[in-house]
Amino acid sequence: MSVQEYLDKHMLSRKIEDAVNAAVRAKTSDPVLFIANHLKKAVSSVITKVKARQILDSRGIPTVEVDLHTNKGVFRASVPSGDSSGTYEAIELRDGDKGMYLGNSVAKAVKNINEKISEALIGMDPKLQGQIDQAMIDLDKTEKKSELGANAILAVSIAACKAGAAEKEVPLCKHLSDLSGRANMVLPVPAFTVLSGGKHASNTFAIQEIMILPIGASRFEEALQWGSETYHHLKAVISEKNGGLGCNVGEDGGLAPDISSLKEGLELVKEAINRTGYNDKIKIAIDIAATNFCLGTKYDLDIKSPNKSGQNFKSAEDMIDMYKEICNDYPIVSIEDPFDKEDWEHTKYFSSLGICQVVGDDLLMSNSKRVERAIQESSCNALLLKVNQIGTVTEAIEVVKMARDAQWGVVTSHRCGETEDSFISDLSVGLATGVIKAGAPCRGERTMKYNQLLRIEEELGDQAVYAGEDWKLSL
């Protein structure tokens, strides 16, 4: 092929001439840089390579990380994992070889990306999120993504989403907003974990989390300040109570002292809030995670106590009485998983009382079929969104739409095994979920999410809207 034939085939002369003319019209001070950027924009970006690797999450357990290559650059994503997996959530693929990371290796998921998913996606337009996600679902051919692994599929889905935003030259949160069909973006109220228990901490506290929500702040930046100050006041309160001794932190960064009762924990948090001076502007939320201490039809609140007497078993009716009492005595606005994950009846009844927001996590598992059932039966009134329980960005957007159409609240959530990826921050803003639950204002994998929200608020400038008092339905 001659030089002229090569130029003609790729229309190089025309493209270069257009770039030069554009530089002249713009009267740019750096025409070479302008021309280079102009030519780069003229190239239709496609996925050219997908490379996965095994990394460690915040607990030292393997997870999947992906580098997705396009003509615009390399886009990285990594996925979190929980302390357990539910029956109705997408399958996290692990090797099961006890000789490798005690059976937790994700080498199979990594291989599936490098050999199968990569081949299927090369040449696709990263802006077409729905098509990319559907291509992986079709390749997997199972209802719960057990063939390729939801951890493999989600890592690629998130990386593609980041690449799509870059191709459009918009922030990731804006790209997600566009994908969801929303006209507005909203900075969420952070639900900071301040006390940890349950499966997330090595203490005697059966309840999984007590959180604070700075709904009275005017901006996310102020909310973050209040959360940090309350957290450190709480640390001081616990130290004083323990005679100057500190305490451990849980997997999500929350403080984890030995606590004998839910009321004791709430009193500690109440005192910390009082010390900040933001009393009426900071509310409390609780993740009961009742499934973890449900034995048959009873709830054992002493399940983690070394000196358990067996006298602290509660029926579902007893639990409802307890919730009524604490919601009357403390500024509690939201309770997550107040009953066992299969106890639809009592969850529905408690929700009907209208005492506070009732969030479904273990009850729903971000599963569209269970969300649909809960909507039809009025079982709860808020969704805890865990993207890794679904497996793709597109499906996450769809389940949020279901919740919003039902006038539910939505809480975007982290997992106990987190990574340095801050995708859920952009997701929460783009989908205007109203609340984000990303752990304590402590530990890098948690603060990474909150710090990203600071950057988003700064980037949005005068257009930034903080959910604040409208945290339930950020419309």
UniProtKB/Swiss-Prot annotation:
Cofactor: Mg(2+)
EC number: 4.2.1.11
Chief location of this protein within or outside the cell: cytoplasm
InterPro entries recorded: Enolase, Enolase-like_C_sf, Enolase-like_N, Enolase_C, Enolase_CS, Enolase_N
Presence of keyword Cell division: no
Active site, UniProt feature: D252 (proton donor), K386 (proton acceptor)
Signal sequence range: none
Free-text comment on the cofactor: Mg(2+) is required for catalysis and for stabilizing the dimer.
Modified residues (N-acetylserine): S2
Localization (cell): Cytoplasm; Nucleus
Residues holding Mg(2+): D287, E336, D361
Keyword field: Acetylation, Cytoplasm, Glycolysis, Lyase, Magnesium, Metal-binding, Nucleus
Chain positions recorded as substrate binding sites: H200, E209, E336, D361, S413, H414, R415, C416, K437
Biological process (GO), any one: glycolytic process
Reactions catalysed, as given in the entry: (2R)-2-phosphoglycerate = phosphoenolpyruvate + H2O
GO molecular function, one term: magnesium ion binding
Ranges in coiled-coil conformation: none
Pathway(s) this gene product operates in, as recorded in its UniProt entry: Carbohydrate degradation; glycolysis; pyruvate from D-glyceraldehyde 3-phosphate: step 4/5
Superkingdom of origin: Eukaryota
Record GO cellular component, one term: cytoplasm
Family as reported in the entry's similarity comment: Belongs to the enolase family.
Quaternary structure, from the entry: Homodimer.
The protein, known as: Cytosolic enolase 3
Protein species of origin: Arabidopsis thaliana
Name of the gene this protein is made from: ENO3
